[in-house]
A protein has these predicted regions:
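Generic "edge-of-domain/loop-turn" microfeature
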Residues: 13-15, 34-36, 62
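A short, exposed loop/beta-hairpin motif centered on an aromatic-Gly-Thr core
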Residues: 20-36
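Short beta-strand element of the conserved SAM-dependent methyltransferase core
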Residues: 4-10, 29, 59-62
Length: 64
């Protein structure tokens, strides 16, 4: 199983100002393929940051 570093962008709309708040996270996950690694990272982000509305993996790199 390979290890991947997956960068995930989390976003939510602030109701007070109707503006978009964005935070970027990075996870290192073990997975057999890049697609599964991306899915795992998004799932971890959803569990840890429930206050965000959208999650998008924007970069994935295979680690040695």
């Amino acid at each position: 199983m390979s290890k991947y570093r997956v960068h995930v962008e989390c976003a939510k709309t602030l109701p007070e100002t109707n503006s978009l708040y964005v935070q970027c996270l990075s996870y290192v996950v073990g997975a057999p393929t890049e697609g599964i690694a991306r899915a795992k990272a998004v799932e971890m982000a959803r569990q840890h940051y429930v206050e965000y509305d959208s999650f998008m993996p924007y970069h994935t790199e295979k680690l040695k």
